[in-house]
């Protein structure tokens, strides 16, 4: 056995259960434990952090299962990126793995974990050195500034490793995968907050963060446009939720016949969405990474992927792969042909990426 194979086959990992099937109670316990730890990690701020240039990307933090400014600021980004890179290399034949054997699967998982660790280190360094998560500006040019940078990188690396192993815990001991769980947790928290929060918006002291309180407020003062926007957001959320539950429950029966037993056949039920939401998660995380990299490159004076004006992408690749609020534009009466073109490109990219 070569040194490389020895490293791959002896990487630290979460031990799987000894029994073949875990009880529902056992899986629920580990899933809830991982969820609680995830929320606690999101409340631990990075020590030595000054300027948090990423805090404006709230939507991206939900997709990446991250909490910018906390120890899990990297989220699932490195894990997803490593998985995408390895699948592309394996699918194109550049790197070949025999996934039909146990050893081949172990090598594939080992390389995938190494790539995830590499991207954890790489993204931690980039986030700090390119100004996304930087130490206080008053320490710039001092030895303390460099030390705080190293400390921030270490904290991000530690948080990324914890999420990596928590993903393994959920995959082996809980329900589904950690990636799906962390994203679902962030989405659920965001939906609850944006629907019911009575806290005033920091951008508009007269408005509420929650859609329901803001809908009531806008109706009482006769603000039809805001009321329409809030109502559209609530109805769209309910419609998507109902549609997702219905489609997820759909099954397609595949007829099977047996050559050795003439006249005998069965129907094998398969989920209509056989791959679940994993392809969508991977593409969404990829696009989120593009937007993050575009912002970091712009901060570094190299807007190779495009530029932002505030929180809005206004040029380059990032402008075309950013989601468009078409419904909001229609309600406001500001819909343009450019908005439709951008939305079409975004949808096409999402569909093609998910299928591939």
Where are these regions (language model features)?
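Core subunits and conserved enzymes of cellular information-processing
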Residues: 1-356
């Amino acid at each position: 056995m070569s040194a490389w194979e020895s490293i791959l086959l002896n990487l630290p990992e979460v031990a799987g259960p000894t029994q073949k099937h875990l009880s529902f109670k056992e899986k629920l316990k580990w899933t809830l434990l991982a969820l609680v730890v995830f929320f606690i990690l999101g409340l631990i701020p990075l020590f030595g952090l000054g300027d948090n240039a990423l805090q404006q990307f709230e939507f991206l933090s939900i997709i990446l299962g991250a909490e910018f400014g906390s120890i899990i600021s990297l989220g699932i980004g490195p894990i997803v990126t490593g998985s995408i890179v390895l699948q592309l290399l394996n699918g194109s034949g550049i790197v070949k793995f025999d996934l039909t054997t146990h050893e081949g699967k172990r090598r594939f998982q080992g390389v995938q974990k190494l790539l995830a660790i590499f991207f954890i280190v790489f993204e931690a360094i980039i986030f700090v050195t390119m100004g996304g998560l930087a130490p206080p500006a008053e320490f710039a040019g001092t030895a303390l500034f460099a030390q705080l940078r190293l400390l921030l990188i270490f904290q991000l690396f530690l948080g990324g490793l914890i999420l990596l192993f928590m993903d393994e815990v959920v995959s082996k001991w809980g329900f589904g995968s950690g990636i799906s769980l962390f994203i679902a947790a962030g989405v659920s928290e965001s939906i609850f907050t944006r629907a019911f929060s009575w806290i005033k918006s920091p951008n508009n002291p007269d408005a509420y963060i929650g859609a329901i309180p803001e809908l009531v407020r806008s109706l009482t003062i006769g603000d039809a446009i805001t009321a329409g926007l809030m109502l559209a957001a609530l109805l769209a959320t309910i419609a998507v939720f109902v549609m997702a539950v219905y489609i997820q429950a759909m099954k397609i029966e595949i007829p099977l016949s047996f050559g050795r037993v003439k006249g005998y056949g069965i129907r094998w039920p398969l989920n209509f969405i056989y791959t679940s939401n994993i392809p969508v998660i991977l593409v969404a995380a990829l696009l989120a990474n593009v937007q993050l990299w575009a912002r970091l490159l712009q901060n570094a004076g190299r807007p190779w992927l495009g530029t932002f004006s505030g929180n809005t992408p206004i040029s380059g690749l990032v402008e075309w792969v950013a989601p468009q609020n078409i419904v909001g534009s229609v309600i406001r009466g500001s819909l343009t042909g450019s908005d439709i073109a951008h939305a079409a490109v975004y949808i096409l990219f999402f569909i093609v990426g998910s299928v591939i």
